[in-house]
Amino acid sequence: MGGKGADWSRRAILAGLASALAACSPGSLQWGSRSFSLPWGGDNGGGGGLSPIASAPKERFGRGRVNVALLLPLSGNAALSQLGQSLANASKLAIGFIEANPNIGENITISLRDTGDSAAGATSAANAAVVEGVKLILGPLTAEQVTAAGNVARAAGIPLIGFANNGSVAGPGVYVLNVLPETEMKRAVRYLRDQGRRGPAGIFPATPYGEALATAFRQQAIAAGFNPSAVYTFSSISEAQQIIDQAKPLIERGMIDALFIPDRASAATFAGLLAQAGVTNETVQLVGSADWAHDAGLLRNPALAGATFPAVDEAGLNAIRADYAARFGGNPPQMATIAYTATILANVNTLSLATPPYEANLLTNPAGFAGRDGLFRLYADGRSDYALVIKQIGTGGIVTTADGARI
């Protein structure tokens, strides 16, 4: 995906503040899975954002002897810095959990550093962390910042676990802890296979993020034993009727019995056109994306009744809501569980107390780890995998039809 991939993830990592931080976010923001969208062009990491002064951490918390850096945007773009502060709060909450539990060793001290909203800021913060002597870097948040900080960390031989949702920025020693497009698609196509569906197809927007989803769909469908029936792309919603007209003969011949429509901006339109064409959910299972999870209007649309979509199990976020509100006020954003999980992971005895700490073979343990969002695994190529649940839109609301017990 190259630069395009970095761009969709950079803009994408901003959109979810509308639901979680609605009072402080621009009205145009809407919650999507773990991803965010603001009109912010270019891949240069922030268009004029000032590099923060990185001579000293903004804050330190924890009482352990192993130094770990947490790089987050705490200045610059208002929405991004608000999210960054919320993730810092979630990390503090995790440290508080460690300190309050006598059965958990206090192994780490977190040094919180500001990346601002630019790649240059991430480079500066990472360099300062290296000079400080940290053994692990958590963050930063956006794809181009992970790339920038990752270059510094890799040169210093320090592993980095970033929070971008774009797997193209991952690599040996630079991990991304987030729900990636391939993770969503793998969970969704395996569920279809388990349900006896045999002819998956997909409709994707001609955008960098849409291209990432389409590529993941093809790869994961083949890996699950499918031969994808068709992959359609569109540049404008005005093309929707033409795509349905092309798909209808394949549906009638039984070649398409499941249809991915992950783009929440167009999903209801495609579902409505299918219904007008006489296609029922019994004939074709509609499948969305984790981006649907917090779009209340979309989930109430009758045209999407019966549709399924992969999602992060909400139990983890619900488990920290009360403590977060009591300590910091307000509700934690969906991404709070990522920072919380990363902090707990950094404190794990077998990782932090190893010699040397955080070796690649330890971080990529095939058994994976149990995080706030359920099971997850890091791979040698830097990508991650999550055990997602499957949700279904029912007449009485959203129900979980398959759990995330395995990856």
Where are these regions (language model features)?
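N-terminal secretory signal peptides
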Residues: 1-23
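An alpha-beta-alpha
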Residues: 176-233, 329
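Bacterial Sec signal peptide processing site at the extreme N-terminus
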Residues: 20-45
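Segments of small-molecule ligand-sensing domains
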Residues: 327-402
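Short beta-strand elements at the ligand-binding edges of bilobed clamshell
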Residues: 159-161, 168-190, 231, 301-313
